[in-house]
Amino acid sequence: DTDRSRGLGDVYKRQVLSGGFVSKAPMYVMRGAMPIRSMSYYMNCWWLKYGVRMFGKWMIPSVPFKEAYFLEDALKFRAALPDAPLIYVGGLVSRQKIDEVLDSGFDAVQMARALLNEPGFVNRMKQEQQARCNCGHSNYCIGRMYTIEMACHQHLKEQLPSSLQKEIDKLEKK
């Protein structure tokens, strides 16, 4: 809503509260399970491909996804820095939760997977009070971003190999 924008023209002056570096602790920052088969499928180097398949689940541990997973910690920053311009980031997939975050005093929110899954999500939220993106949190998009472009499996032009589709289905049932 435009009444919530609070002068975002100077958004570059705000601080984004982050959970760290994706390259150092990917699933802590992004949450969920890393789709090891999908990630290794796109690797060109044979020894890396098989090494990741064999040891990936120990190298990249899963961290359960919960919507707005950094909110509890971010609220501590908000309380300690009441006048600081802060942007919340971390697992926002519904208008309801975005409204909750903004109502908690954050100046803006940042989203990634929700928009990758549904590029028109922000426009849909303007129309629907209960808008929620359809991201299943299989993290296929993350698994392939290290070797080819980042993309949601729900919007690919090509058909996925059955082994990758099976992995995605299993991860999205959790």
Residue ranges, per PLM feature:
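Glycine-rich beta-alpha junction loops
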Residues: 19-23, 115
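Extended, intrinsically disordered, low-complexity segments
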Residues: 27-174
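Single conserved hydrophobic/aromatic residue that forms the stacking wall/gate
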Residues: 1-12
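Short, well-ordered beta-to-alpha junction loops that form the rim of enzyme active sites
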Residues: 2, 19-20, 91
